Structures are given as C-alpha cells and as structure tokens.
Amino acid sequence: MKIQSLGYILVETKDLSAWDHYGQEVCGFMKHPDFSDEEKLCLKIDYEPFRFMVQNGPEEKFLLAGLELGDASALNDAKKIFDELNINYQQLSADDLFTRQITDGISFNDPAGNLIELYHGRLNDETKFTSPKGISGFVTKDLGFGHVVYAALNIEETHDFYINVLGFGDSDIMNLQMSPNPEDPKMKLYFMHCDNKRHHTVAIMQSPTPPSGLVHTMVEVKTIDEVGEALDRAINNDIHISSSLGRHMNDKMVSFYMQTPGGFDLEFGYDGDQPDWSKHQTTSSPAPSYWGHVFTCLLYTSPSPRDRVR
C-alpha cells in the first residue's frame, strides 16, 4: 500500500467561533467562504478545499485524519488487503464524500483506536488561498499538509500496523527518559514516512491517549519570519504556548508548539528535512531537539512528567 500524504483532519468543537478566531487570526489560515457554514468551519491553507474541518458537536476533540491514496485502484487494493487481514472498515457515505470533497474513501481504526480515512480524488477548488495574516504560503503539495502524532500504549502493535499494513517506513526512533529517575522506563516514539519526502507524516508515542484525542499536528510555512510572527500572534491572543522555539533533531524543523481550542497542540514550523528515502537509514535521535523546545508541561506522556524537556 502506498499512502501519498496527510490530506486533512476533522475536529469536533462546542465553539466554532473560537476555532474561527484561532485559525484566521493566529494561524493565518483562510476560512473557506463556500464550504463553511453554521455547523462547520473549513480552514484552507493551500490549493485544496480545506485541510482542517471543524464541526459542531458536544465535545472538544480531534476526530480523524484523512490519508490520501493515488487513485481508485490504490483504494481497491487497500480494501483487498483489509479483507485478507480481516480488518474492519466502513465505506464513506455520499454525504461524507461531499463534505470532504473527495471521490471515494473508507474509514477504519488503527490498533490504538485512532480513526483514519483512506481516500482518493480530492476535488478541485477554484477559490484561491489568501492568508488573512499575509502568510506567503504553506509547504504542502506532494508533501501533504503536515503530520499527526498519536498516543499508543500498545505501541509495538500499532507500529507494526503502520509499517506492515499501511506501508509506512521508519524515519527515526526515539527512546526518551522522561523522568529524572534513570531507573524509570523510557518512552518510545516512532516517526514514520509515507510515499513523499516529508520526514514523517505519522508518529506514535508510547503513552495513554489524551482527552483531546491527539498529541499534535503540524503545519509548515516557507520562512522563519512567518514562524516568529505566528508566535507573536499567539502570545498577543493569549494562546497557551506549549513549547518555546527550537530545532528538532530528527526532521530539523524550526518550530514552536501552541495549544489549539481542541486541546491538542499545533506545531508551527519551518525548514523541515526532506530525506532521499533511497539513501536514508533509520536514525535513532538521542534527544527531541538540538536547542530550544522547552515544554511548559508534558501532559499524558509519563507517570513522572518534568517541567522541562530538552
């Protein structure tokens, strides 16, 4: 199976206005004028109809991620693989297909319980992306819109599913000491790539799933100034900054983390690595970052969290 990229995420909220303000005034996303209405907010960051869809509901939580396949044949092949392995999946309804602006798709759960959609054929959108905050553009196209990081207590089973069923490859593996006590067990993280040059499209960390349903997602801009300006906007709008500016060791991304209205984090970055997979060997980074990325807290990631992670 060859998954091309991360196409979109869906989020549930009790307060669309909070997401509207956050998406436009802090992140610089564009509210799609045609697909947004009183029940949902579609946030556009490039040529696609949207990358974030936020819909009214009883909770504040991440719902699902949509992973893109190349064509109808690839989707049919995925169904055959699932059938052979007795993996349950559901066909997306006509309403779902229209709402997501896709041609066809299915949904299923990974072994950690995360809801995923596989789809093909994103419909064309004639509405040009114009950032309300003057962002020159987000790094997307063949790379997809970014990445998602899930929590998975059954990390080895979940990792095996992504590698051997969905066809991902390992980019980097971390084993981090989260507690000041060196005798405490380390936390494992797998960073996995699909069929594009983004360093990782999905990552999983060995921890309980947070109440928000997701650890974080990521978007990438084209200049370091646009990262700094987003950080200023977040601070000026009283957004919780989950991590200071820093450069990651594995994907070289310069970024900061801020909390979304849904409770999960958004990494806002620049200059992510784009490996040549024909030459890449899986790395084992000894630390999350070369510098910076001081986290204000480590919720849901360790029984003995510390205030700073270097």
Features from the language model and the residues they span:
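Core segments of cupin and vicinal oxygen chelate
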Residues: M1-F50, Y150-H199
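N-terminal beta-strand motif that seeds the catalytic metal site of vicinal oxygen chelate
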Residues: M1-S17, F62-L67, N124-E157, G169-S171, ...
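Catalytic cores of nucleotide-enabled group-transfer and carboxylate-activating enzymes in metabolic
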Residues: E12, W19, F50, V54-E60, ...
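Conserved active-site tyrosine of GNAT-family acetyltransferases
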Residues: W19-Q24, F82, G113, T158, ...
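A structural feature that tracks compact, well-ordered secondary-structure segments
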Residues: Y22, M53-G57, G66, Y119, ...
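Vicinal oxygen chelate
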Residues: E84-G144, K188-H193, D238-S302
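Intrinsic, low-complexity N-terminal interaction/targeting segments
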Residues: E126, N196, H200-I204
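Single conserved hydrophobic/aromatic residue that forms the stacking wall/gate
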Residues: Y300-R310
